[in-house]
Amino acid sequence: MKRADFCIIGLGRFGMQVAQSLKENNFNLLLIDLDDKKTDTASQQFDYVICCDASNLTALEELQIDEFAGVIVGVTNIEASIMICANLRELGQKNIIAKAKNEVHKRVLSTMGIREALIPEKIVGKNLVIRLIHGLENEIINLGNEIIFIRSAVNNKAFFNKRLEEINFRQNTDANIISIMRSNKTVVFPLGPNTEIQPGDIITAVCQQKSLNKYLNYINPKTKNKN
């Protein structure tokens, strides 16, 4: 098996949504769940899916979990979530993002040294507000700590057939471009300085929330954004 970039444990709605978004951006994934029905369903969409008990330290150790770029824990059961996160920490995985059921669960995970504990319902609310402010046509996700993940079409004709090195998004907008989806749905990743912007491109980027208006106005100068 090719080394996956991310491991997702727990294939409920949250875990599968994260997996689908990462897949669309050309990341390699390993998906894990204890429920064989969920893994059977997931295996129809993803290449690497394992049915195993992630609360079992030995099972995780065999997967060399510390070599993954990050692990997303989407388990709903609080006790199982805590056990899995404890195992991940013991095995040396530091980049852990975990779903929390409530504020108490979130605090427990934070005290364990989990990098990010998220309550999905609150995140959804924040994302909707940001989209209402900046335009519902943009796919915007608040990653926490004022960091925004955004996917948006490029309508600035001045950028068409120009190289990323010439446009210099980072210097002009404080945004980092992650990937580009062409009009034929082909995803360009990773990107290089000579990668060109073409008509119909949809760009995925990460930026600070305070720089979002600057970025959107740069790629779509006719867009009227509030604030």
Swiss-Prot record:
<dbReference type="GO" id="GO:0008324">
    <property type="term" value="F:monoatomic cation transmembrane transporter activity"/>
</dbReference>
<dbReference type="InterPro" id="IPR036721">
    <property type="entry name" value="RCK_C_sf"/>
</dbReference>
<dbReference type="InterPro" id="IPR050721">
    <property type="entry name" value="Trk_Ktr_HKT_K-transport"/>
</dbReference>
<dbReference type="InterPro" id="IPR036291">
    <property type="entry name" value="NAD(P)-bd_dom_sf"/>
</dbReference>
<feature type="domain" description="RCK N-terminal">
    <location>
        <begin position="3"/>
        <end position="119"/>
    </location>
</feature>
<protein>
    <recommendedName>
        <fullName>Uncharacterized protein MG323</fullName>
    </recommendedName>
</protein>
<feature type="domain" description="RCK C-terminal">
    <location>
        <begin position="134"/>
        <end position="221"/>
    </location>
</feature>
<dbReference type="InterPro" id="IPR006037">
    <property type="entry name" value="RCK_C"/>
</dbReference>
<dbReference type="Pfam" id="PF02080">
    <property type="entry name" value="TrkA_C"/>
</dbReference>
<dbReference type="InterPro" id="IPR003148">
    <property type="entry name" value="RCK_N"/>
</dbReference>
<dbReference type="GO" id="GO:0006813">
    <property type="term" value="P:potassium ion transport"/>
</dbReference>
<dbReference type="Pfam" id="PF02254">
    <property type="entry name" value="TrkA_N"/>
</dbReference>
